[in-house]
């Protein structure tokens, strides 16, 4: 199987990720932070080592401001729900994932908040000037997807974040497609909150996510319960990270995420360059196939994502045919209907290709040849 669905989750994982998870399960699979015996302490040390590695990688000065979650969706929900109040205004774009749009819709449907959607320019990019004009005294949060789940186009988040800072509005970045690939830190993005999965560019396992918080940004917790601290009180502790990490943490997942971060950190830029070369090769080959439309502006910066629509608009059929011939891609709306509505592809959807760290040129050439054969 040629795996080109790395925008959904990276696969295969580095061998050290598998080993780290196995070791945690086999040798010290106790409950971190829930006991004083040796195994619980060892489990806790692994959790904190991962937190420290993530904090260093993400430019978070205090490791306790890196919060473990199950995925990017949970990180986004924690940030959104925890930062909003009745009467708040939220600004986001047509590029947002349902992990942003559905939480917002719940509160809009209750007449508790209002949402402004910013339209991108012809290149698919958001304008800092347009954002500046959109912000009002009611704006409580600005949310931007760093790179589109559909087209891969990278937004000018640093400039957008500077506008938010200038206007005193918290800025949340959805780094689902960029963490572990681009330089994603609080300072480089001018972000106050960064939500990300552990299982994509960071090369960790499923069921892992992170939320990075700038000092002074303290959303209300999403889940309340046991933290292993302040157990004498029925009130949720204010101590970080305990405030946000109720319940048993995913020790095997966090052990694997630590190994993933250690794999990515020293070679992030090279991984990005290599994935970009492979994606450029793929786009060039797909452009030569009659009957395919490639989504997204050619001149816009992008991560290694390419989405196409076949003539006739049956993206699901093309994705299924590729699967039957040994190529794993994703067809449909990619949980981003607002973007497809903007692109005019709500009915057709698209077929998304996303090379990863272990993709080869041969994989790209073979996949393109199969697409060409299927489009005849």
Predicted regions mapped to residue ranges:
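Pyridoxal 5′-phosphate
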Residues: 1-376
């Amino acid at each position: 199987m040629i795996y080109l669905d790395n925008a959904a989750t990276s696969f295969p994982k580095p061998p050290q990720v598998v080993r780290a998870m196995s070791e945690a399960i086999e040798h010290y699979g106790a409950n971190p932070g829930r006991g004083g015996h040796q195994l619980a302490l060892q489990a806790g040390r692994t959790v904190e080592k991962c937190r420290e590695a993530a904090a260093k990688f993400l430019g978070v000065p205090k490791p306790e401001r890196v919060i473990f979650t199950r995925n990017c969706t949970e990180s986004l929900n924690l940030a959104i729900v925890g930062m909003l109040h009745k009467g708040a205004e939220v600004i986001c774009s047509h590029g947002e994932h349902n992990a942003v749009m559905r939480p917002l819709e719940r509160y809009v449907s209750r007449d508790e908040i209002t949402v402004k959607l910013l339209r991108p320019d012809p290149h698919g990019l958001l304008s800092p000037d347009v954002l500046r004009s959109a912000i009002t005294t009611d704006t409580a949060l600005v949310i931007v997807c760093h790179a589109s789940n559909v087209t891969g186009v990278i937004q000018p988040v640093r400039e957008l974040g500077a506008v938010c800072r200038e206007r005193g509005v918290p800025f949340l970045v959805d780094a689902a497609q960029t963490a572990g690939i681009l330089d994603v830190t609080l300072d480089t993005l001018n972000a106050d909150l960064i939500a990300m999965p552990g299982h994509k560019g960071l090369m960790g396992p499923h069921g892992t996510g992170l939320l990075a918080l700038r000092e002074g940004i303290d959303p209300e917790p999403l889940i309340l319960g046991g933290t292993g601290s302040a157990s004498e009180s029925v009130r949720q502790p204010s101590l970080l990270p305990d405030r946000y990490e109720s319940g048993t943490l995913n020790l095997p997942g966090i052990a694997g995420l630590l190994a993933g971060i250690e794999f990515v950190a020293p070679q992030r830029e090279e991984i990005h360059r290599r994935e970009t070369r492979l994606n450029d090769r793929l786009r060039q080959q797909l452009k030569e196939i009659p009957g395919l439309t490639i989504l997204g502006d050619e001149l816009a910066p992008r991560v290694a994502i390419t989405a196409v629509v076949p003539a006739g608009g049956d993206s699901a059929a093309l994705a299924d045919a590729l699967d039957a011939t040994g190529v794993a891609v994703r067809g449909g709306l990619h949980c981003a209907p607002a973007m497809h509505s903007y692109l005019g592809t709500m009915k057709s959807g698209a077929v998304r290709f996303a090379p990863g760290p272990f993709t080869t040129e041969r994989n790209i050439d073979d996949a393109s040849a199969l697409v060409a054969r299927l489009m005849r």
